[in-house]
């Protein structure tokens, strides 16, 4: 470390990605709280438990997709730094295709084995009544996985090239303007209740993910 010299420019470049990335995590937490609040309004705390358990399982299924996105971030950064835009485009396309295949497989497995998976999260006598509800929710949210590769690739490619603000904007549009607004519209305004909120989350995810994908394609 005796050769280390501080560089204000490098610190600024790091913070351009680090701060928006941190804000994205806060937004995702805010999304969860907003959905939970709406579920309490239209239903009961049981609906919150079902949603929480279902999304926890979906989050586990997203781990491979996050791994692919992290790899994309690294490759995209190297390609952008080397001015190799063709490699940037290729890595972006391949990550989406690979992620889509994985999400389709995981989504199908989740749909087929939803009752068995739900049982793992409601095995006690006190929570046994939640099993069919969690299984039903899983069969709805498995469609959520299909759109994840598009949105996550768009966000991570922007992070890879140092444009953290663009990645943050994608998250804001997807989580706040699409998922929360549509969940509120379908669940509360139109009166579809719990199912309306679930549908709003999925449709909002689709809209937000396609926006992120399209913006990243235009940028590349």
Question: Which residue stretches match the model-derived regions?
Answer:
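Transmembrane alpha-helix boundary and packing residues in multipass membrane permease domains
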Residues: 21, 25, 33, 37, ...
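Membrane-helix interface segments
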Residues: 46-47, 164-166, 193-194
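Short alpha-helical transmembrane segments in multi-pass integral membrane proteins
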Residues: 1-18, 76-144, 187-220
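Small-residue-rich hydrophobic transmembrane alpha-helices
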Residues: 50-114, 148-170
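Hydrophobic faces of transmembrane alpha-helices in multi-pass small-molecule transporters and flippases
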Residues: 3-34, 39, 60, 64, ...
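Helix-terminus/linker motif at the lipid-water interface of multi-pass membrane proteins
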Residues: 29-54, 60, 78-79, 118-125, ...
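Short runs within selected transmembrane alpha-helices of multi-pass transporters and secretion channels
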Residues: 66-69, 141-160, 166-175, 182, ...
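Alpha-helical transmembrane segments of multipass membrane proteins
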Residues: 24, 28, 32, 58, ...
């Amino acid at each position: 470390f005796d050769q280390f010299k501080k560089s204000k420019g490098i610190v600024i470049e790091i913070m351009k990605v680090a701060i928006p990335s941190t804000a994205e995590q806060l937004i995702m937490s805010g999304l969860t709280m907003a959905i939970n609040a709406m579920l309490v309004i239209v239903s009961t705390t049981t609906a919150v438990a079902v949603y929480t358990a279902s999304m926890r399982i979906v989050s586990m299924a997203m781990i491979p997709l996050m791994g692919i996105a992290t790899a994309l971030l690294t490759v995209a950064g190297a390609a952008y730094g080397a001015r190799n835009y063709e490699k940037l485009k290729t890595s972006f396309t391949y990550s989406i295709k690979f992620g889509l295949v994985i999400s389709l497989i995981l989504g199908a497995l989740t749909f087929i084995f939803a009752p068995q998976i739900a049982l793992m999260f409601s095995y006690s006598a006190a929570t046994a009544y939640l099993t069919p509800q969690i299984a039903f929710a899983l069969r709805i949210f498995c469609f959520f996985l299909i759109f994840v590769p598009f949105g996550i690739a768009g966000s991570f490619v922007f992070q890879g090239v140092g444009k953290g603000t663009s990645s943050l904007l994608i998250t804001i549009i997807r989580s706040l303007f699409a998922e929360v607004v549509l969940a509120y519209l379908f669940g509360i305004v139109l009166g579809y209740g719990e199912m309306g909120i679930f549908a709003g989350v999925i449709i909002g995810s689709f809209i937000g993910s396609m926006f992120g994908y399209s913006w990243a394609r235009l940028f590349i």
